[in-house]
């Protein structure tokens, strides 16, 4: 196979489209491969530079290609779009990636390590827990208001509200039971958030 100077690779869950050029900017590689075929092909290929669109699974793919000796460039999708010359499809996207990576002013996304991705996952878990806590807090306030129990906004005012609810014996038994379940859920969420915060600080 003629020497390849760089490759643009359009990725999906199962199919990968490769577009490679030589030093004269002539296309010398156009391949559509399944995942296993693609990794087997690139593992045997002489080290070259490969551009991939930055997306969810691109960092894992980039690390694997780096382990084969290739240099990997990740490019944000919006920076690739101007280089698509014809209708958007896998082959056009791969060619656009190959073209975009050659531009001297192109900005690349650093390839994240597995550890960096795990840390970002932890941040994502925290965000989801915070959203769940906010949703639950709003629900508790809304239900409490229906029984004439109100409190000022803010997380600091929720615990006193829960204490008032627990102490209010005029509430129907079912309402008291449901409020108790929500209070327990809130405490569990807060404990999870505290645990995640401790890991982020460590």
Q: What would you call each of these model-derived segments?
A:
Residues 1-202:
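A detector of single, family-specific signature residues
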């Amino acid at each position: 196979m003629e020497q390849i100077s760089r490759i643009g690779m359009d990725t999906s869950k199962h199919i990968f489209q490769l577009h490679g050029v030589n030093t004269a900017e002539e296309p010398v590689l156009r391949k559509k491969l399944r995942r296993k075929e693609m990794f087997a092909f690139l593992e045997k290929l002489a080290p070259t530079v490969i551009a991939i669109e930055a997306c969810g699974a691109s960092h894992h793919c980039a690390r694997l290609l780096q382990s084969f000796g290739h240099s990997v460039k990740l490019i944000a999708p919006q920076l690739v779009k101007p280089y698509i010359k014809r209708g958007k499809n896998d082959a056009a996207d791969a060619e656009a990636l190959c073209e975009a990576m050659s531009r001297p002013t192109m900005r690349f996304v650093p390839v994240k390590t597995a550890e960096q991705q795990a840390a970002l996952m932890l941040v994502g878990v925290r965000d989801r827990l915070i959203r769940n806590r906010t949703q639950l807090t709003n629900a508790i306030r809304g239900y409490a208001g229906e029984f004439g129990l109100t409190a000022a906004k803010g997380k600091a005012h929720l615990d006193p509200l829960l204490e008032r609810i627990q102490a209010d014996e005029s509430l129907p038994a079912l309402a008291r039971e449901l409020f108790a379940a929500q209070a327990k859920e809130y405490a569990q969420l807060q404990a999870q958030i505290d645990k995640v915060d401790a890991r982020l600080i460590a």
